[in-house]
Amino acid sequence: MKDKIVFTVVLILSIIYIVIGNKIAMKNNSILDQVSKLDYPKGEVTRIIERKETPIYVDGLEDQYNTDITFEAQVTSGEHKDELVIATQNISTYISGTIKEVEVDDKVLLYNTQTQEGQSIWYFVEYSRTDALIVLALVFLGLILLFGKTKGVKTMISLVFTVLSIFIVYIPAILGGQNIYAWTIVTCTFITISTVILVYGCSRKTCVTALGCIGGVLVAGILTLIMNGLLNLTGFVDENAIYLQQLNSKIDLKAIIFGGILVGAVGAIMDVSIDIASSLNEVASKMERPHFKDIVKSGFNIGKDIMGTMTNTLILAYIGSSLSTVLLLTASSHSIAYLFNLEMITVEILQALAGSIGILTTIPLTSVIAATLYSYADNSKNVYKYKGGAQKKLVTQKIDNTKDNDDLVLTSENRTSSTSTSSKRTKSKH
């Protein structure tokens, strides 16, 4: 009953955070106000009308041309739903490379514009890929329910709040030019607390997990702030940063590096924290009187097994996300020293190292917090068994170094008692 009440309260508070957070983030947010007015209806290609190639001449390049494909499509969403429209796809080998040409039955996104004479002109924008992604997401959620059952449902709910906190609150706040540092800390804290309570309930283990995770995230954040100054970072790591600056000059690009590192690392740090907290909770529950030093030592031993795989996971995730950039720069004619001093590469390395250090510091932090909270517990229990009006006390098993000695003492006492009884019987016979 208590767990249900806690779950319901956290669920309501999470909804309140999303609603109020979105209102604060959207305050005076002119960028998203403009984006929300844009409409890209979906359509399905019904036939190809014309394909026209026009050669273009670029210095030093041969066989460059523009291709205009005129096609008919049926609009499947928006105010023009079910209408047949004529649209154009433009492909330039000089700019776009090998973009796939539209074919019959392709699902596409369209854009409609009006000429001065009031005539509608439709253009191909992009292929509609959401349907396949939705199917894949449903498979993912189905597997969570299949393997997790009740906890799987809680995991799905926490995942929904995590996604909403990023896309409904955090990103609008950044685009609105608000304090990225503050919003990053708030978002990571919300994700951590809501996830561990919704999935694992409210307990000492949950408290240890949350505190350990937040501590690891703060260490990664402080390290990032220090390195931002030492590395003379500007935040202009690629062309996307330039576009962001043009959208809103109030956006702090250096703070985006900070936010990217913390948000990217919070999941792995939380994973390490819950692994250690859960393991130490089990270890402490088997001790009659848990000792601080023993729990800390166990936490460090468990952490040694975790750190290798989790650190590799984080570093490989960062490398994989920027693999094309790494390949391009590696294949260039620049020296290794030049490549490693590029801000783009420096930021990638900083992300991997700061996140990994956050994971490593989470291990001792979580171990110490767990030892502090778990060592107050008294797990000694005496079970009483009643039979024939006589009260017999059963000795609880102890998991400590004195177990063997206690067993020897009990065995000796039993043998002494048995010997005494035998002697008395012998005397009575005589």
State the predicted function of each range.
Residues M1-L38:
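Hydrophobic secretory-pathway targeting helix
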Residues S36-T67:
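Structural detector for short beta-strands of small beta-barrel domains
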Residues G221-I357, T366:
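Generic detector of multi-pass transmembrane helix bundles and their immediately adjacent loops
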